Amino acid sequence: MQPYSDNSVNFRMMLAGYRAAARRYHAGRLTQDVAATYHPLFEALNWVVALDEQAGARWSPRGEPLGSKWRDEIDGGDHVDAVRFARNRAHHQWADALVLSEGFAFPITFPLVTHEWAWRPSTDLPKGKNDSGRLAYDRLLANRPARFSLQQLDETYSYVADLLERPSAQPSA
């Protein structure tokens, strides 16, 4: 896996960083340690934004990069819209967009966990000037566990990686 000709890191390399953070998040969910989940969740969500920027800058199916419009072209792009809405409202303070809940979230998965990070309702997010992505946020993220978002975003970005770059062996992360 080589960087792009301008020496930037390629999309699959960035996706591997996202996946490594998501794996650490899922492993941390099995502990009693809140930091073991928050730190990798914060990292994974920042990877989401970096991958979004790369997809918009690099994907040009009609000759010109699509920018944020790439999200309208594929299934799952609305999840990226929703996360971007949260990020823009929280101004990089992901703790303002997520809440730690104690107890179980449905559907129940095994092994059982004692805590779960979930997205706050949009009405609880800091106020902002731009409502772009709010409907997607309310529909897809609000009051739902972050783990569901991480899975959907992985599927979305895997598809984008196949569009941008030929599939090849991924680096271990």
Which residue ranges define each predicted feature?
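Acidic, Ser/Thr/Gly/Pro-rich intrinsically disordered interaction regions
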Residues: M1-F42, G63-A173
